[in-house]
């Protein structure tokens, strides 16, 4: 099968067909280009997706990736990044091995096609020229033959006419002979041109056109083969990255199999374990029996020798407000909301054995008053986060991490010690290097001046000493915490028993539960006595504030036991300091022994105000 023999007369159709073939090739090139753009865009989107979910440095997200599930997710993100890289490889290989190669081949193909069809048109024009010469020779031969016939007929007519002179007859004969010769010459020329045309025509249809069409056929077949090879390359480019993509997927599977739910659960314990023991049982509070309260100086002195009783008067406030100084807390509160009780009817205090009772006051007013200082929270959590909650709002973290639970504090301190030790080791290595360099300079002065290293060596030595002092400080705190952790169960039980005696359940829960719902914590100092549970770290924030000054004195006219929150018990005849006079609500704020503060009914005391203090 040959286009030269089978399609010898389809020159124009072959020209259209070969142009269509080039268009198909260019269409395939465009397809591959768009595929490479898709691969690049897909790879870019995958990389952006992987980058988007990568943990940010020095953020809370980075700490979350200690869990195996998060580590597996991080591995998945990294594998997806490599996966995106393989799609970039696909794009690059398709561009270099297919697109660029085919574009160059298309240019060569267009040039070859143009040359072949140029040769075809040239041969076609040549045969057309030969045909025109043949037609011209044929017409000339035909014309000469006709003129020769007419000249012969004219001669015969003149020769037969007796009236024509002999000269005219001779002239007609000569003219006929000339025309006859011209016809013979035209015949010979026509014959020669015809023979030549036939030769050219045979060569055109049997040599030139078959050769040209054969070249065009081979060109077209090469184009078809080339596009097939490009399609194979297209598949091979994809196949080459399949093993690497498979490894990426295997990496994701391996990361998924590395997830350990038990390990993650243990990490949660390590991250949030406080080191405390659960609170003890709450004792039954029998309201049918009268509560015993200390109302005399003798009971006050006796309570110092032994374990103090739990009272609702001034002494009990050390238990009610374990995290705040007395004067600071009381400065936040107003006088009791209900009116004070009237003085007893009997002039003698002994006529009223138990003294007048101030009206029962619900627990809610105190919470309302305390809300002036704190945001609205459930009463059971009223004082849990008072210390650290304020420090968090102020953005302040104690250097010794005392706002963390014991276990978490120990981990923070241990981490700080490890960091300092690493810095010390780094500075020590630098000092050793400088020392060695100085020794080299001493042995070989031409290499450098040893004195030039003295200042640097001094700075490094000072840094090491500073870091060691810092490390010793944190190691001391760490030793303190580690020494305190084993005894925390006994301490927790002691504190639980201490606050179980309180009748105010809200305050009891606040004292036992040190951790607020938002995770803040106030650490207890185990060295403090049982009857005075305070938070020194929180107290330090108010050390710069002085207690309210006394503006006068007062003498108790009647005994007042002060059962309600915010009140203080007094004994008839007792002298106390006045720190806030009656605001018109019937209550006067007093202080006893620079330690206890509270409100008493104004009618129960006789007030002697200091004029200078009042005026100021």
Curated annotation (Swiss-Prot):
Residues 513-616 are annotated as: Required for interaction with TNKS. The keyword Acetylation applies. InterPro entries: AH/BAR_dom_sf, F_BAR, FCH_dom, FNBP1_F-BAR, FNBP1_SH3, HR1_rho-bd, SH3-like_dom_sf, SH3_domain. The keyword Phosphoprotein applies. The record marks 166 as: Mediates end-to-end attachment of dimers. Expressed in brain and testis. Residues 1-334 are annotated as: Interaction with microtubules. Pfam families: FCH, SH3_1. Residues 1-264 form the F-BAR domain. One of its GO terms (cellular component) is cytoskeleton. It is found in: Cytoplasm; Cytoplasm, Cytoskeleton; Cytoplasm, Cell cortex; Lysosome. Residues 552-608 are annotated as: Interaction with DNM2 and WASL. Residues 399-551 are annotated as: Interaction with RND2. Residues 280-314, 332-366, 487-531 are annotated as: Disordered. Residues 502-511 have a biased composition (Polar residues). Residues 403-480 form the REM-1 domain. The modification Phosphoserine is found at residues 296, 299, 348, 358, 496, 520. Disulfide bonds: none annotated. Residues 549-610 form the SH3 domain. Required to coordinate membrane tubulation with reorganization of the actin cytoskeleton during the late stage of clathrin-mediated endocytosis. Binds to lipids such as phosphatidylinositol 4,5-bisphosphate and phosphatidylserine and promotes membrane invagination and the formation of tubules. Also enhances actin polymerization via the recruitment of WASL/N-WASP, which in turn activates the Arp2/3 complex. Actin polymerization may promote the fission of membrane tubules to form endocytic vesicles. May act as a link between RND2 signaling and regulation of the actin cytoskeleton. PANTHER family: FCH AND DOUBLE SH3 DOMAINS PROTEIN, FORMIN-BINDING PROTEIN 1. The F-BAR domain binds the phospholipid membrane with its concave surface. The end-to-end polymerization of dimers of these domains provides a curved surface that fits best membranes with around 600 A diameter, and may drive tubulation. This is Formin-binding protein 1.
